[in-house]
UniProtKB/Swiss-Prot annotation:
This is Cytochrome b. Keywords: Electron transport, Heme, Iron, Membrane, Metal-binding, Mitochondrion, Mitochondrion inner membrane, Respiratory chain, Transmembrane, Transmembrane helix, Transport, Ubiquinone. Pfam families: Cytochrom_B_C, Cytochrome_B. The gene is MT-CYB. InterPro entries: Cyt_b/b6_C (IPR005798), Cyt_b/b6_C_sf (IPR036150), Cyt_b/b6_N (IPR005797), Cytb/b6-like_sf (IPR027387), Cytochrome_b (IPR030689), Cytochrome_b_C_euk/bac (IPR048260), Cytochrome_b_N_euk/bac (IPR048259), Di-haem_cyt_TM (IPR016174). Binds 2 heme b groups non-covalently. Heme 1 (or BL or b562) is low-potential and absorbs at about 562 nm, and heme 2 (or BH or b566) is high-potential and absorbs at about 566 nm. Component of the ubiquinol-cytochrome c reductase complex (complex III or cytochrome b-c1 complex) that is part of the mitochondrial respiratory chain. The b-c1 complex mediates electron transfer from ubiquinol to cytochrome c. Contributes to the generation of a proton gradient across the mitochondrial membrane that is then used for ATP synthesis. One of its GO terms (molecular function) is ubiquinol-cytochrome-c reductase activity. Heme b b566 binds at H97, H196.
Length: 380
């Protein structure tokens, strides 16, 4: 078996990636989320495939086809709710994975980090298009509002929006193409994940100390396969509790009403995992400014390596920057809450304050904190 594992052209790639991979011995449970994201991706592709067998991407029948899946298909209700809540689990793992990367300075592995940002955008695009497919009220109006943001682009904006719509409003052509893109994107994401892993295995994993761990590496199997398996069990347990006991808790009741272009819902809002970015978008009165802030709220991650001023890689031994980091996390929770609130006082002012705080902490306060900590170290 050892000979095949190490000599076979295909199996040896798997061997070097998941079995004999030299791994830092001290990586904590925060390093579990990569494998959990892989598990989420596999679950989403499988449940999505079974849903696609029964779904019809036509405005006249899309809503009915989803109802048919839930009522008439064997375990269709389970597949549908696993897919819907699987997206939420995916984003929980994604946010924790990115948060871990920021905390432990993993952004210094620039190729891996940039690939991760591309993956984040791809997953967000996939989730957005998937939310449109059931063709409920929030699906329709969410698609209308978010695609309309592109009209803020000077000169080509309106033409671009109509090109994406395939007409002069969100209609049959839009739904059909969104289904096509929603189907193909997860496979593109899978390919990007392999590139992400390729870059990661060029440098090796980071670790909680941020120090070089070449002198203290252990094989990935069995130590971390067991650890990842435990993480997967915990994730699946939480996921099944969510899916079987609270399937609609993260959804919007408006999406159980068929799409009606003549009736606007009182509060148009995206799924919970986009609310922080939506709050940043709404906090700027100017349309183009809002769109730029929305894109920058994610793209700001790309300049994190440039904002790293500390002599130490991680935040493990940096209490001042740690404080800034946890204030940033609290700020993101506030933004998520504000994104789901109506546009009225005091929510608007809270949203604007939280949006300013978000960019200020990342661009100004954390780099300054890093420099202060450098000076404290020099004093010693």
């Amino acid at each position: 078996m050892t000979i095949i594992r190490k000599k076979h052209p295909l199996i040896k790639i798997i061997n070097h990636s998941f079995i004999d991979l030299p791994t830092p011995s001290n990586i904590s449970s925060w390093w579990n989320f990569g494998s959990l994201l892989g598990l989420c991706l596999i679950m989403q592709i499988l449940t999505g495939l079974f849903l696609a067998m029964h779904y019809t991407s036509d405005t006249a029948t899309a809503f009915s086809s989803v109802a048919h899946i839930c009522r008439d298909v064997n375990y269709g209700w389970l597949i549908r709710y696993m897919h819907a809540n699987g997206a939420s689990m995916f984003f929980i793992c994604l946010f924790l994975h990115v948060g871990r990367g920021v905390y432990y300075g993993s952004y210094n592995m620039i190729e891996t980090w940039n690939m991760g940002i591309i993956l984040l955008f791809a997953v967000m695009a996939t989730a957005f298009m998937g939310y449109v497919l059931p063709w409920g009220q929030m699906s329709f109006w969410g698609a209308t509002v978010i695609t309309n943001l592109l009209s803020a682009i000077p000169y080509i904006g309106t033409t671009l929006v109509e090109w994406i719509w395939g007409g002069f409003s969100v209609d049959k052509a839009t739904l059909t193409r969104f289904f096509a893109f929603h189907f193909i994107l997860p496979f593109i994401i899978t390919a990007l994940v392999l590139v992400h892993l390729l870059f990661l295995h060029e440098t090796g994993s980071n670790n909680p100390t941020g120090l070089n761990s070449d002198s203290d590496k252990i094989p990935f199997h069995p130590y971390f396969t067991i650890k990842d398996f435990l993480g997967a069990l915990i994730l699946l347990m939480a996921f099944m509790i969510l899916t079987l006991f609270f399937p609609d808790i993260l959804g919007d009741p408006d999406n159980y009403t068929p799409a009606n272009p003549l009736n606007t819902p009182p509060h148009i809002k995206p799924e919970w995992y986009f609310l922080f970015a939506y709050a940043i978008l709404r906090s700027i009165p100017n349309k183009l400014g809002g769109v730029l802030a929305l894109i920058l709220s994610i793209l700001i991650l790309a300049i994190m390596p440039l904002l790293h001023t500390s002599k130490q890689r991680t935040l493990t031994f940096r209490p001042i920057t740690q404080t800034m980091y946890w204030i940033l996390v609290a700020d993101l929770f506030i933004l998520t809450w504000i994104g789901g609130q109506p546009v009225e006082y005091p929510f608007t002012i809270i949203g604007q304050t939280a949006s300013i705080a978000y960019f200020t902490i990342i661009v100004i306060l954390m780099p300054i904190a890093g420099m202060i900590e450098n000076n404290i170290l020099d004093l010693d």
